[in-house]
């Protein structure tokens, strides 16, 4: 087995990739990097500074964003020595993060943060996002693309929060899928060598079992 083993997990919104990545990393005793949380952190910081989303092309906003210093430690995100991890989930951030994530200079900044973390990782790491196997970590030892139909993903979101309206959530997911797939820079797509996991008809535990099975097969192959 190589001294550093890298696993990339990509997939659309609400596919369960983040939960799967977290569980897989825990079971393998690997480090885990949630790339979506970095975009959320930048979104949170920008909204905290400007209240509403400003023009991302203006020089003062660009300068502010480029000077943001984020630290990721033990799956927690710190800004100005403050843990902001638990503040990154909310409707405003949900509605805004897609606009932040499609801006070229922001993506370049996030990619640098991600690659620095990956390069400094000792041992194994599980990295999840939307462009991991294609852009951030194309040299990953193992790549997964976790997906499900938009309808399945909307139903799961509603089960997690009964106050959600199914039709509204479905529309949001379809819009996010369209935006991710048609994004000019680093669109969502599966890597050619990724293992596709469609989890419409399997449980979360079965998904994890399948990921571990594929990992063990890869380790066996490397040890031959």
Curated annotation (Swiss-Prot):
It is an enzyme of class 2 (transferase). GO terms for biological process: nucleobase-containing small molecule interconversion. ATP binds at residues 11-19. It comes from the Eukaryota. Its EC number is 2.7.4.25. It catalyses: CMP + ATP = CDP + ADP; dCMP + ATP = dCDP + ADP. InterPro entries: Cytidylate_kin, Cytidylate_kinase_dom, P-loop_NTPase. One of its GO terms (molecular function) is dCMP kinase activity. This is Probable cytidylate kinase. It comes from Enterocytozoon bieneusi (strain H348). The lineage of its organism: Eukaryota, Fungi, Fungi incertae sedis, Microsporidia, Enterocytozoonidae.
